[in-house]
Amino acid sequence: MFQKQERIGLVVYLYYNRDARKLSKFGDLYYHSKRSRYLIVYINKNDLDTKLEEMRRLKCVKDIRPSAFDDIDRQFVGNLHRDETNNHQKG
């Protein structure tokens, strides 16, 4: 049966857009901004350390930033109520 794998998104900044094809072997290319010269690449979390190390060694890569999606609070129920109580306590 299909098992869901934990994945993480990486924002990879490039020096030149022509080097985007070189990064397709590391994971799934989700988006390529030709104007801002960055890619969004999704890779498996268990391969993160090895693939990140290999990607940083490439001369075409300027910078790599991991996605902050896991750090964001996605519990939306009651967010407005929490904000109202925090504002009343401050003021």
Curated annotation (Swiss-Prot):
Span of the signal peptide: none
Xref: Pfam families: DUF2129
This protein's UniProt keywords: Cytoplasm
Record flagged with keyword Cytoplasm: yes
Subcellular location: Cytoplasm
InterPro entries the UniProt entry points to: DUF2129
Subcellular location, principal: cytoplasm
TM helices/strands, residue ranges: none
Gene Ontology CC annotation, any one: cytoplasm
Family: Belongs to the UPF0298 family.
Name of this chain's protein: UPF0298 protein M28_Spy0318
Organism name: Streptococcus pyogenes serotype M28 (strain MGAS6180)
